[in-house]
């Protein structure tokens, strides 16, 4: 008989929480203010947990310390701390260092968040990645001069502990580099003001989602962005033709050699961070000469449309698969249900207030469309400044390649999100 465990789950995720509770284990839930204010917390699930702690955020050490102290006072044994978002990764690492009997090295948790330490570890493992330098203070003129003399332009400037492409800028010249830093904009969600600067890498941008149990993949799915993320985001100013924002999953049987290379690549990346049992996303580039270049990794799935896209591919909510795998090591999903899967995120041509969205029922009725997810609504203001600003997501899924391609092409060409500058009105149709 499997021994009953006590699990500490950080943040709200319905499907994952449900799977953990259905396993018969005790689940202690830690929620932050964002969870309470923005998620529909289901009382029936909440009532099944051992108890719930509330913290202001997972960056608040005093709140997390109080949670750990209460657990210690109860003399409870916590078998596993589970975190699935970047917003809770550092806090979860801190908690497990205080409440788990044999905690993982806290620096391992930091290394999958801080991009400077991340790339240092990857380089030490012999994996190619962009040359990069730390910029702890954007106003440090001496350090900036050193960076300009050392790195080859263009370069990418981004927060060392950022989220996706928030506050990420490309500088093509030393002069542009200085101009960006003289007036650097930090998105509100970016917690640290320290930056990293790295040389720009060209090529096809890939993403790899995996669940690892005892060092082996329970699922391993690779995809390719329609356009490199920075190029897509950079085209949103309205001054140039807008590039599509989306991705397609790559079938293993059609890309067997690439999958073999990616599996070896990700095993080496995991080893650099001592990852054996975790969910991971690895982003990388395939250069024009075919070389794989590491970009970033995290111990969570990709954001935005990645979770529903992978779920569509595997035929069930991916959090159910992850929950089973992390608990029992037996999570192998069923055979791929949808062979061809992808997504696009429709955004307005220019920043502003949304005045019209494509009709959901009409888009959903297109053969090859699996799901329509209008993240934003009419009246919302979009800055279009980073890739985590999702607007109108369409998930595609089909066993027929022609149907799949036709659906993606039709949605991207026939349907549009319309916006106007703040303070104006417009009733233009979204189609």
State what each model feature region is:
Residues 175, 199-275, 279, 286, ...:
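ATP-dependent carboxylate/phosphate-activation module, predominantly the ATP-grasp catalytic core
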Residues 114-196, 201-202, 213-214, 250-264, ...:
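Active-site nucleotide/adenylate-binding loops and adjacent lid/helix of ATP-dependent enzymes
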Residues 9-15, 33-34, 87, 136-139, ...:
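Short beta->alpha connector loops
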Residues 323-431:
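Peripheral (often C-terminal) accessory segments that flank ATP-dependent C-N-forming ligase machineries
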Residues 5-6, 79-80, 222:
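Structural motif
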Residues 169, 199, 250, 311, ...:
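Short, well-ordered beta-strand elements within core beta-sheets of diverse protein domains
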Residues 42-135, 384, 389-390, 403, ...:
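Conserved N-proximal alpha/beta basic substrate-recognition cap immediately N-terminal to
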Residues 3-74:
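Domain-scale detector for complete catalytic domains at protein termini or as standalone homologs
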